[in-house]
């Protein structure tokens, strides 16, 4: 079996990575960071997100595993003290694949510029580059509202536990193939109105943001933020692709939520 291990880069994570590579050396395991079948992330959720995007073109061939070396990582099932056990289990190849939905976003620009497509594990947020953020929200080609505020966040089910949660969005179980749109400081008065609530969209729904005035936006895909100019449309939909996790033990989603936000 081919595997690779990525580390947060701190001393604790780097040492654990080296120890695991040495442990895998005792089994029929090949280190391959080009075409791995297993990707192990050591660190926190930021490290995991980086690993996801590094291999997002090979998601169907990869199963991910997270080991948290700091605060509890939402995508990490394992602690450093369990690393030796994980090595032995992986060497046996006895694991189940659990899949989570992802978010696909297409950004369309003015004439002459090729559109860009992004895949998000947590969320994709859109904000103004400086001026007022005003966009028309269109759902399945039907105009829904004109939004004015700081920005909008579209999240995956697993991503609802991230930025979406801080915006007051609902938490969604990742078995639900859907996406959730939450507002960032919307303007609501006698003149301007928005729905003022998070919106959950099922698979096959398409949500479009169409600029009204300013067409330059700061778009963040998970942990990566880029300024996009001359944006004509931003289209969200549940991706046909999924991320796969290698699971060796039961760790129910709501137990994960409990341990992350209430108590460990």
Kindly label every feature range from the protein language model.
Residues 1-36, 72-153, 161-264:
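Catalytic phosphate-donor-binding core of small-molecule kinases
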Residues 24, 55-58:
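Active-site catalytic pocket residues across diverse enzymes, especially alpha/beta-hydrolases
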Residues 30-51:
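Short, well-ordered secondary-structure micro-motifs within conserved domains or adaptor modules
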Residues 41-43, 66, 155:
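Short beta-strand segments
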Residues 47-52, 161-165:
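Short glycine/serine/threonine-rich phosphate/pyrophosphate-binding segments
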Residues 60-76:
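Short, acidic/small-residue loops that bind anionic groups at enzyme active sites
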Residues 63, 157-158:
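Proline-centered helix-kink/hinge sites
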């Amino acid at each position: 079996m081919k595997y690779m291990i990525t580390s947060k880069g701190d001393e604790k994570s780097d040492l654990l990575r080296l120890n695991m590579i040495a442990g895998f050396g005792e089994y029929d395991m090949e280190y391959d960071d080009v075409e791995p079948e297993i990707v192990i992330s050591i660190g926190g959720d930021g490290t995991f997100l980086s690993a996801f995007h590094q291999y997002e073109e090979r998601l169907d061939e990869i199963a991910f595993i997270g080991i948290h070396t700091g605060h509890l990582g939402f995508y990490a099932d394992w602690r450093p003290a369990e690393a030796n056990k994980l090595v032995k289990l992986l060497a046996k190849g006895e694991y189940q694949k659990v899949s989570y939905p992802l978010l696909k976003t297409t950004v369309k620009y003015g004439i002459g510029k090729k559109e860009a497509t992004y895949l998000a594990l947590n969320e994709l947020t859109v904000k103004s580059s400086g001026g007022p953020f005003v966009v028309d929200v269109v759902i399945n080609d039907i105009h829904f509202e004109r939004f004015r505020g700081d920005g909008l966040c579209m999240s995956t089910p697993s991503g609802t536990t991230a930025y979406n949660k801080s915006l007051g969005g609902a938490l969604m179980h990742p078995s639900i193939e859907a996406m959730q749109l939450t507002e960032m400081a919307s303007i609501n008065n006698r003149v301007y109105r928005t729905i003022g609530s998070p919106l959950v969209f099922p698979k096959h729904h398409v949500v479009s943001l169409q600029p009204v005035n300013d067409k330059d936006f700061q778009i963040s895909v998970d942990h990566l933020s880029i300024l996009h100019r001359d944006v004509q449309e931003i289209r969200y939909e549940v991706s046909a692709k999924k991320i796969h996790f290698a699971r060796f033990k039961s760790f129910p989603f709501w137990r994960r939520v409990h341990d992350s936000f209430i108590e460990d």
